Amino acid sequence: MALYPFTAIVGQTEMIRAMLIATVEPTLGGVLAFGDRGTGKSTAVRALAALLPTMRAVAGCRYHCDPAARSALCPECRNRRAAGRLASERVRIPVVDLPLGATEDRVVGALDLERALADGVKAFEPGLLARAHRGFLYIDEINLLEDHLVDLLLDVAASGENVVEREGLSLRHPARFVLIGSGNPEEGELRPQLLDRFGLCVEVKTPTDLDQRIEVVRRRDAFEHDQAGFTRRFAADEAALRRQLVTAMKLLPLVSVPEAILRLAAKLCIELGTDGLRGELTLLRAARAEAALEGDTVVTESHLRAVAPAALRHRLRRDPLDESLAGARVERAMAALFSQAAIAR
C-alpha cells in the first residue's frame, strides 16, 4: 500500500516544518502536534517515513547501531567489533508506531519465549524502543497513554538507553529516538513532565480557507482512486525535499549562532517567564536547523522568529489575566523584543 506523499500535504506549514527541523536536528527533543481530528497529523508522520533518507548502520544489527559511534554500540556490536567483524550497510531511518494498547513487554522488549521453549536459551526479543533507535517513535493520542508507559518513556528519553531487568534477563541497549506525539486536547491534557520533553509543539487546526479545504479533498480523493499515479505526480518534489534534508544534515555542524542572537533568545525566554534553560537550548537548536534547511551557515533573527512559537508555546505558565493562546503571547513578545533590538541598532 502506497503512502500519501509528504509534499502533497496541503497547508499545516508549521507542523510540516517542525517535522523537517526535528529530522535535521534529532537532539531537539521531538515534536508534539496537538489539534483537531482529521487534520493530517498521522498522515504527515507516515508520509515522513517514506521521505526520510537512508543512514549507515551495522549490518544485521537489531538496533541499527551507528558503526562510527563506538561508545553507543549495543552489546552484540561491541563483541563483533572486538572480533574485528563490524560490516555496515545503508538502511532506512525507522519510523515506529507505539499503539495505545501496547504492553510494557512490547515496548521495552522481553524474553524470546519461542527460543526459550525450543532451545532452552534465554534470548532477548527487542521491543519497539529498539526498533525506533536512531529513528522516530510515533504515538497517536499520546495524551491517553498509560502513566506507567509515560514514566518509562521519560526515563529512556533522559538516558538514551533502555534497561531491561526481567525473567532472568539483564540487558541494556541504546535507545535514542525522535519522539513524535499527536492528540486532541479535548480528550485530555498531557502530563507536564512529558510535555516539557518535546522540543517543538505545534497547533494543528482545521483549515478555514475555502480553496485550501477544496484542494485537500481533491488530492485525497485522487490518491484513493489511483495511489500509484498520484504518488508519481509528486515523486520529483519528494526527491527534491529528500536532497534538501540530506544537505541540511551535512550543513548543520557548520551553522554558527552570533552572540546577538543568543542574547535575543535569552531575553525572549526571560520575557515569557519560561522555567529552566531548556527553552533557550531548544530555541537555538531549532533555529540552527532552520538555518541549515535554508542553506545558511549563520543564524539570523528571521530563523529565530520562525521557530520561536513552536519551541516556546508549551513552556509558558498559564496567566489568568491573559486568556490569549500561548502562540499569540510568543508572537507579541517577539514583536516587542525585535523592535527594541532594531531601535538599538
From Swiss-Prot:
Pfam families: AAA_lid_2 (PF17863), Mg_chelatase (PF01078)
SMART domains in alphabetical order: AAA
GO molecular function: ATP binding; ATP hydrolysis activity; magnesium chelatase activity
Residues annotated to bind ATP: 35-42
Biological pathway: Porphyrin-containing compound metabolism; bacteriochlorophyll biosynthesis
Keyword list, A-Z: ATP-binding, Bacteriochlorophyll biosynthesis, Chlorophyll biosynthesis, Ligase, Nucleotide-binding, Photosynthesis
Biological process, per Gene Ontology: bacteriochlorophyll biosynthetic process; photosynthesis
Catalytic reaction annotation: protoporphyrin IX + Mg(2+) + ATP + H2O = Mg-protoporphyrin IX + ADP + phosphate + 3 H(+)
Disulfide cross-links: none
Entry's EC annotation: 6.6.1.1
InterPro entries for this protein: AAA+_ATPase, CHLI-like, ChlI/MoxR_AAA_lid, Mg_chelatase_ATPase-isu, Mg_chelatse_chII-like_cat_dom, P-loop_NTPase
Other known facts: Substitution of the magnesium ion by a zinc ion in this bacteria has been shown to occur after this step of bacteriochlorophyll biosynthesis.
General function of this protein: Involved in bacteriochlorophyll biosynthesis; introduces a magnesium ion into protoporphyrin IX to yield Mg-protoporphyrin IX.
NCBIfam families: BchI-ChlI
Family in the record: Belongs to the Mg-chelatase subunits D/I family.
Name of this chain's protein: Magnesium-chelatase 38 kDa subunit
Species the sequence originates in: Acidiphilium rubrum
